[in-house]
Every structure is written in structure tokens, then in C-alpha cells.
């Protein structure tokens, strides 16, 4: 290749406040300096795509050079890195317009000229113009030599700038079609004068561009030593895995690709690969990992999908495409028509983004539904790793609340195990005749839940109760009022009514007992006063003298504990004391004529009930004093 300056050299100022913009971009716009290579290879890919598209109707543009690609070479002596392509190239006017203006791209102009159908087929990126200027992150000067397809060698153009507000442009001779970008590297950019560093960056950012990317490497002799002779070696695969038909990709390839995008050593549990054409054209490849990352609940945890636009890598951790409760999902989305902000690091919050988010969310939920139905063992592995995160779903995603609810798993009295294997659908299938509610209990632990006195009548009547003991559970139930038309009912709430499971004789007996016990209830109210909201009789207990419950719309015990643990203000919870009139201890108290001794029994009843419900009491000394006096009364 030979380039010689000829005529018509001029110095021009940039058409905007480029000096300030370059300074801002270099120090703020891009998060890491190696992105410059992604931008320049992306631009080269655009140029090749433009030529390929134009050559469909004008094949003579190839001029005998139809092997399209991008080539990278470096010169340690000159301290330069060169990115070359044999794409569409630029004329002098195009150079001035496209390289002399910030936020202007030849791609956007080219794209606007296409008909709707053509634009579907032309894979173009770069709807803005700052990508080229990212070269100044690592270079203190940039030379561009370019020759437009179909033009003569003598009509080539050279552009040169130090990024300080002005540039020079002149006409040169250039034998080959396309563009060479020569970066004169600053000190902190010299790390890119390395074949292995370039290989690493190309593999990271450009492995799945549909055109080959080559680097110039030394030819080795028989002893494995580098000679002065060089050759071009293709570095990228030049075919994106997700663009291939699903039938052409093996399970092993899917697993290896997962490890590539996630940096995980384990195989994924399951994946979903889909290409969608229509209002939005995109491909998604979504994976469910086998293990949760250690920082899944860390607020700083980065999550989201890899974003590609027309097979060019744009960013990691694009959280806009997945709700927070699905933050464990790995994979990518490749959009053909997604608009981006000028930095490509920040997605525009627009209708396309929202549409893709909804589609990806439904895809993941469907994938999980299939796993739950067809592979219960794997779904149980998934639940152990990500169940707590899934429980955030009903609060965050109202539109998919029923789907999320069907994926939740709990322990229950149906199985004597702390394993959360019970689905809400299976619970509903086992509901007793006449049962119209889904009964549940929240507690600090599985042991506390399964031994709760609130369960006594449910056990005697054979009614299944869901046992919840994760810290998030009571918060979750605020956002999950029903499932399949069946309302949820906490069995620790005052509104609990099991009368539909009693026969008439039982109801009549309870009514008589309640009437007889009224005076005892009044005595208890008089002694306990404002320490409880109310005192009432209950027939849901068998082996326990009393329990405390809260009103249906009052904060529950577990929610109060959750707020307290988070350092949040906790409103005072006023409990209702429910007393079992058929328990021997309560009968003994009812027969007690001495008010002081009666008061001690009242202390014991309330203290036991509070201890069972909360695991603590406000004044243990008062409770212990009453117990001691009852055990060893003074003579």
C-alpha cells in the first residue's frame, strides 16, 4: 500500500466545541479505555456492511477485492496502532462532514436513505458520531487515510488531528479501497502494542461480529522463534453463535458459550434461545445459572444481560432488560433496531427497551414454568439458589404476579420437612371440601412454624397450612392477596374463621361455652388493660391455653421484626389475647376467687402467648415473678 500527499491541504476547525467535548468524553464518557478498539472495529464493520449492501446493486464496487475484513497491525518503533478495513471508504466531503463534527455519523445518514425493507437487511450500527473520537482516549494524534469505493487512487483523503479543536485534510494517493486509522499512542496506550493484548480485546468485544478481524503476527521458524516474516491471522469467530439456527447449535456449544459470557465454571441449569421478527427484530439467549453469585443480595451487585446491537458488543450488565427479581439471569440480547445514547453505555429509556424487557421477562418465566413442570429435581436446585429473589417478584412485577406465584415454593404441614417443595397449585388441589382460603403461617424458623400453637385446630381437622419462615415472607404476602381466585389467610390474624368445618352440634357447644366464659374474659380485660387490644375466647386451640393474634389489617410480628432488623421505625403492635376456655390451666384460673392470684395467672397466659408468638416479651421480670409466686406461694 502506498500513500503520498498530493494537493489541496487545508486546516479546519471542528464544527462544535470539540476540545471541551473530547476532554469530557476521554475522562467521563467511556468507562474503560480498551473500548476505543471496540468502537473503531465497530466503525470498520459498518463500512464493510455498507459496501456489501451497495455492492448488491453495484458489484463493480468490489474492484476485484471482495474478501472483506478488518486488519490490525502495530509498530513498536513508531508507537502506532493501525486499524484497516476494505469497506465503503469516504470522500473528502464525507470526511469533513463525518469526522469534523461531534455526534454526527455517516452511518445515520446512510441509514436514513434506505427503504424500510432494505434497512431490515443492512446491519448497520453507529447512529451517532462520537465512537471514532474514542481513539483519543489512548492516542495523542490520529491519522485517517481513506478512499471511497468506486473512486480513483488519486482521490483518496488524509485527515489528521491532535484532538485539540482543529484538524487538517488533504488529498493523497491510496491504492486500496477503504480506511486506515493510525493511532499515535500516548504513554498509557502502549499496552496495545502487544499481539496478546489485542487478541484479548478482540475476543472480548468483537468475537461475534459477522466479518473476520485479523492481526498481523510473526511467522515462527522450526524452533518456534519469531522470524521477520509476518502473516495475517484471523482472531474472531466471525459468526455469532446466537445468530445460528437452534438446530445447528449443540448443547455443549450452548454450555461453553454460557461460561464465556458469565465467567462461570459450572454448566447452566437451562437456557432459551429465540429469534423474533416483527415490530422489534431481536435475538435473545438467556441462561439460568446453577449457582447463585455470592453477592446476589448486595446492592452494588451488577446484573443484567450483555447487549449487542447487530452483533456488535455494546455493554455488559444491561439491567434495563430484566427486572430486579430476575437479576440472576445471564445471557444476551442482540437488537437490530434499538436506539442508543451517544456513549453506548447508557440505554435510552424508550418503548423499544420496555418492549424487549417485557418479552425477556416472559421468556424467563416460561422457561422456569417448563422446568418446574418437566424437571422437578432441577427446579428444586434452582429454588434453593434463587427462591428468595423470586419472592421479590409479586411486589415488583404486577403484570406477571400470577405467573410468579405459580413458581413459588414453600414448606407446609402436608410434608414433615423444611424443604420448600410445595407449589400453590398443588396446595389448591388438596384443599378440603368447603375450603375457600389458602391458609399460611409466618414464623422465625421452620421449627417455630411447625410447632406453632396456631396449627393445633388445623391439624385436628386435617387442613393443610403453608409454613413460611424466610424473612421476606410476610412482606411478600402484602403483595400476594390471592392465587387462582383463592384468598390467602394468615392463621395468626384475628379474622380467622373455621366455622365452615364445624357441625351444628359443635357450633352450639362453642356458643354455650363462650357465653359461660364471658365473665372470665371481662376479668382478664380488667387486669391486662391497655397491654392488649382485646381479650376473646377461641376454640382453635387444643393443647395450648392462649395465643396472641393481630387484626387483619395490622402489621404482623414477622414484618415488625423485618423492619426493626433494617433499622426502620416500627409502629406499636397491639395484640389480641385469645384464650382457650377448654384448657385445664384456663379453667383453674377461671375458678380462682383471689384477684391477686388471678392476676398472676393472667400474666402467665399473656407471657406464654407472647413468647410463643414473638420469641420475647416486654417485661420478662413481671412474667417470671408471676410464675415463681404461683409455683411457690407464700404461706
Curated annotation (Swiss-Prot):
Q: Does the keyword Transport apply?
A: no
Q: Which locations, inside or outside the cell, does it occupy?
A: Cytoplasm
Q: Which Pfam families match?
A: HATPase_c_3, HSP90
Q: Give the Gene Ontology MF terms in alphabetical order.
A: ATP binding; ATP hydrolysis activity; ATP-dependent protein folding chaperone; unfolded protein binding
Q: What are the start and end residues of every segment in region (B)? A: 345-561
Tell me which Gene3D superfamilies the record gives: 3.30.230.80, 3.40.50.11260, Heat shock protein 90, C-terminal domain (1.20.120.790), Histidine kinase-like ATPase, C-terminal domain (3.30.565.10)
Sorted keywords for this record are:
ATP-binding, Chaperone, Cytoplasm, Nucleotide-binding, Stress response
Q: Cellular component GO terms, alphabetically?
A: cytosol
Question: Please, which domain of life does this record's source organism belong to?
Answer: Bacteria
Concerning InterPro entries, the annotation shows: HATPase_C_sf, Heat_shock_protein_90_CS, HSP90_C, Hsp90_fam, Hsp90_N, Ribosomal_Su5_D2-typ_SF
Q: Which CDD domains match?
A: HATPase_Hsp90-like
Induction and repression of expression = By increase in temperature.
Where in this protein does the record put region A? 1-344
Q: Which SUPFAM superfamilies match?
A: ATPase domain of HSP90 chaperone/DNA topoisomerase II/histidine kinase (SSF55874), HSP90 C-terminal domain (SSF110942), Ribosomal protein S5 domain 2-like (SSF54211)
List, in alphabetical order, the GO biological process terms annotated in this UniProt record: DNA damage response; protein folding; response to heat
Segments carrying the region annotation (C) are 562-635
Q: Which family does it belong to?
A: Belongs to the heat shock protein 90 family.
Q: How does it assemble?
A: Homodimer.
Sum up the protein's function in the record's words.
Answer: Molecular chaperone. Has ATPase activity.
The name this protein goes by in its record: Chaperone protein HtpG
Species the sequence originates in: Vibrio cholerae serotype O1 (strain ATCC 39315 / El Tor Inaba N16961)
Q: What is the lineage of its organism?
A: Bacteria, Pseudomonadati, Pseudomonadota, Gammaproteobacteria, Vibrionales
Amino acid at each position: 500500500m502506498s500513500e503520498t500527499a498530493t494537493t489541496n491541504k487545508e486546516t479546519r476547525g471542528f464544527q462544535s466545541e470539540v476540545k471541551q467535548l473530547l476532554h469530557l468524553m476521554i475522562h467521563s464518557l467511556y468507562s474503560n479505555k480498551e473500548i476505543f478498539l471496540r468502537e473503531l472495529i465497530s466503525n470498520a464493520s459498518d463500512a464493510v456492511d455498507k459496501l456489501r449492501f451497495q455492492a448488491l446493486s453495484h458489484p463493480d464496487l468490489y474492484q476485484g477485492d471482495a474478501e472483506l475484513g478488518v486488519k490490525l497491525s502495530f509498530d513498536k518503533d513508531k508507537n502506532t496502532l493501525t486499524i484497516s478495513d476494505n469497506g465503503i471508504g469516504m470522500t473528502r466531503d464525507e470526511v469533513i462532514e463525518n469526522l469534523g463534527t461531534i455526534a454526527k455519523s455517516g452511518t445515520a445518514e446512510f441509514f436514513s436513505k434506505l427503504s424500510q425493507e432494505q434497512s431490515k437487511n443492512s446491519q448497520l450500527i453507529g447512529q451517532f458520531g462520537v465512537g471514532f473520537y474514542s481513539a483519543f482516549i489512548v492516542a495523542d494524534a490520529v491519522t485517517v487515510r481513506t478512499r471511497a469505493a468506486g473512486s480513483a487512487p488519486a482521490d483518496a483523503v488524509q485527515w489528521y488531528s491532535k484532538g485539540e479543536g482543529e484538524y487538517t485534510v488533504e488529498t493523497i494517493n491510496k491504492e486500496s479501497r477503504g480506511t486506515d486509522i493510525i493511532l499515535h499512542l500516548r504513554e498509557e496506550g502502549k499496552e496495545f502494542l502487544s499481539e496478546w493484548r489485542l487478541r484479548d480485546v478482540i475476543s472480548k468485544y468483537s468475537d461475534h461480529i459477522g466479518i473476520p478481524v485479523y492481526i498481523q503476527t510473526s511467522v515462527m521458524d522450526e524452533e518456534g522463534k519469531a522470524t521477520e516474516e509476518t502473516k495475517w491471522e484471523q482472531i474472531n469467530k466471525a459468526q455469532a453463535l446466537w445468530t445460528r439456527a437452534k438446530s445447528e447449535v449443540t448443547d455443549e456449544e450452548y454450555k461453553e458459550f454460557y461460561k464465556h459470557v458469565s465467567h462461570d465454571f459450572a454448566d447452566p441449569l437451562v437456557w432459551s434461545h429465540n429469534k423474533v421478527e416483527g415490530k422489534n427484530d431481536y435475538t435473545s439467549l438467556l441462561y439460568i445459572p446453577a449457582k447463585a453469585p455470592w453477592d446476589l443480595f448486595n446492592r452494588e451487585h451488577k446484573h443484567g444481560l450483555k447487549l449487542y446491537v447487530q452483533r456488535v458488543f455494546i455493554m455488559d450488565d444491561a439491567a434495563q432488560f430484566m427486572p430486579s427479581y430476575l437479576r440472576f439471569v445471564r445471557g444476551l440480547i442482540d437488537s437490530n433496531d434499538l436506539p442508543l445514547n451517544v456513549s453506548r453505555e447508557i440505554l435510552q429509556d424508550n418503548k423499544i427497551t420496555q418492549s424487549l424487557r417485557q418479552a425477556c421477562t416472559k421468556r424467563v418465566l416460561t422457561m422456569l414454568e417448563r422446568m418446574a413442570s418437566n424437571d422437578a429435581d432441577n427446579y428444586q436446585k434452582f429454588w434453593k439458589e434463587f427462591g428468595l429473589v423470586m419472592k421479590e417478584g409479586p411486589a415488583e412485577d404486577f403484570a406477571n404476579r400470577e405467573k410468579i406465584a405459580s413458581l413459588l415454593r414453600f414448606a407446609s404441614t402436608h410434608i414433615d420437612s423444611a424443604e420448600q417443595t410445595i407449589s400453590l397449585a398443588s396446595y389448591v388441589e388438596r384443599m378440603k371440601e368447603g375450603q375457600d382460603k389458602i391458609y399460611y403461617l409466618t414464623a422465625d424458623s421452620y421449627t417455630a412454624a411447625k410447632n406453632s400453637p396456631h396449627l393445633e385446630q388445623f391439624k385436628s381437622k386435617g387442613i393443610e397450612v403453608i409454613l413460611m419462615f424466610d424473612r421476606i415472607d410476610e412482606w411478600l404476602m402484602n403483595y400476594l392477596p390471592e392465587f387462582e381466585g383463592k384468598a390467602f389467610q394468615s392463621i395468626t390474624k384475628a379474622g380467622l374463621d373455621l366455622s365452615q368445618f364445624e357441625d351444628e352440634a359443635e357450633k352450639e357447644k362453642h356458643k354455650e361455652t363462650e357465653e359461660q366464659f364471658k365473665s372470665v374474659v371481662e376479668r382478664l380485660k380488667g387486669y391486662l388493660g391497655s397491654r392488649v387490644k382485646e381479650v376473646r375466647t377461641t376454640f382453635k386451640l387444643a393443647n395450648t391455653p392462649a395465643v396472641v393474634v393481630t387484626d387483619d389489617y395490622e402489621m404482623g410480628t414477622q414484618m415488625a421484626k423485618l423492619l426493626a432488623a433494617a433499622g426502620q421505625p416500627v409502629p406499636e403492635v397491639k395484640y389480641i389475647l385469645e384464650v382457650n376456655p377448654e384448657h385445664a390451666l384456663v379453667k383453674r384460673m377461671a375458678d380462682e376467687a383471689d384477684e391477686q392470684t388471678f392476676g398472676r395467672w393472667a400474666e402467665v397466659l399473656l407471657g406464654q402467648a407472647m413468647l410463643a408468638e414473638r420469641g420475647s416479651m416486654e417485661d420478662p421480670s413481671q412474667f417470671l415473678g408471676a410464675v415463681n409466686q404461683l409455683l411457690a406461694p407464700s404461706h
